[in-house]
UniProtKB/Swiss-Prot annotation:
The active site is at H108. The gene is ilvC. One of its GO terms (biological process) is L-valine biosynthetic process. Its EC number is 1.1.1.86. One of its GO terms (cellular component) is cytosol. NADP(+) binds at Y25, G26, S27, Q28, S51, S53, D83, T84, T85, Q86, G134. This is Ketol-acid reductoisomerase (NADP(+)). InterPro entries: 6-PGluconate_DH-like_C_sf, KARI, KARI_C, KARI_N, KARI_prok, NAD(P)-bd_dom_sf.
Length: 337
């Protein structure tokens, strides 16, 4: 049975008199820094020279230092820059300045799990991973709540790494909702699998295939977009609120019957076998090795995949239709960003 911790299991006093360095001030970074600050914790933000986030952090009343200076000043260092830049940043700025008995923290275990960061033996290494985007972590906290999170300990030099990590989890509000104990390996492997097989890879491929099937059969692209992309949110919201059963309760009997008889024909035993292969590649490090190499060699395939999908018909049709629906809060991105 999973072990869950709540506010009464965590002691925020463990962070009293200590300085927490938040390295990075993006989606998660700003939420962690501001929530900790509001919880009475001494926070500094570590950013690279010329960072556009410096003005935002200072406007929020936070002290901004270089990554090296922030690390040197801190008892707890939370690394919240992208996975792809962590290893180099750790080597150049964090490792040389890390206090001998500091706590090194992450919100995702990729670089620890795959050996891109190897911490010194004398420091605690732990993880607090909110299960929500940063803006939501902040928003819910400001309304007196919290989002669920994961906690893990990779290295317990002090003998108190778990308790200290839970204090951090309480400081950002996760312990209000519940913090589930896991491991760096489990968090990393399941997170990557979810992204690849379901949340990003699986859903994107399914939506495109459905759209293409309808358009190739002669149906209007606009109607195909509504059926295969736009209405997906309506169903996912039902999943989010009450799982599969609530979704089926909420849709028509015709839709529910179609769910039962058609779903297994689309997601077949071959699909599940492919999922198992993806998981094996995550577990044995093949995916990580490929992704690390892709970043070291200029991201040629990554950029090609990105530019190809930007030109997909479903994207063109979607932009036009979303412009007619201001209530969905339409977003546009620069394809090169």
């Amino acid at each position: 049975m999973a072990k869950l911790y709540y506010d009464n299991d965590a002691d925020l006093g463990r962070l009293a008199g200590k300085t927490v360095a938040i390295i990075g001030y993006g989606s998660q970074g700003h939420a962690h820094a501001l929530n900790l600050k509001d919880s009475g914790v001494q926070v500094v933000v570590g950013l690279h020279e010329g960072s556009k986030s410096k003005a935002k952090a200072e406007a929020a009343g936070l002290q901004v230092l270089s990554v090296g200076e922030a690390t040197k000043a801190a008892d707890v260092v939370m690394v919240l820059v992208p996975d792809t830049t962590q290893a180099q940043l750790y080597s150049d700025e964090i490792a040389p300045n890390l206090k001998p008995n500091a706590t090194l923290m992450f919100a995702h275990g990729f670089n620890i799990r795959y050996g891109q960061i190897v911490p010194p033996a004398g420091v605690d290494v732990s993880l607090i991973a909110p299960k929500s985007p940063g803006h939501r972590v902040r928003e819910v906290f400001e309304h007196g709540g919290g989002v669920p999170g994961l906690v893990a300990v990779y290295q317990d030099a002090s003998g108190e790494a778990l308790q200290n990590a839970l204090a951090y989890g309480k400081g950002i509000g996760c312990a209000r909702a519940g913090v589930l104990e896991t491991t760096f390996a489990e968090e990393t492997e399941t997170d990557l699998f979810g992204e690849q097989a379901i949340l990003c890879g699986g859903v994107s491929a399914l939506v495109k295939a459905g759209f293409e099937t309808l358009v190739e059969a002669g149906y209007q692209p606009e109607v195909a977009y509504f059926e295969c992309m736009h209405e997906l949110k309506l169903i996912v919201d039902l999943f989010y609120q009450g799982g599969l059963s609530y979704m089926r309760y909420s849709v028509s009997d015709t839709a529910e019957w179609g769910d039962y008889i058609a779903g297994p024909r689309v997601v077949t035993s071959e699909t599940k076998a492919a999922m198992k292969l993806l998981l094996e590649e995550i577990q044995n490090g093949a995916f990580a090795e490929d992704w690390i190499e892709e970043n070291h060699t200029g991201r040629a395939r990554f950029n090609k995949y990105r530019s190809t999908d930007v030109g997909h018909q479903i994207e063109q049709v979607g932009r036009e239709l979303r412009s007619m629906m201001p209530f969905v809060n339409p977003k546009e991105i620069n394809p090169g960003s």
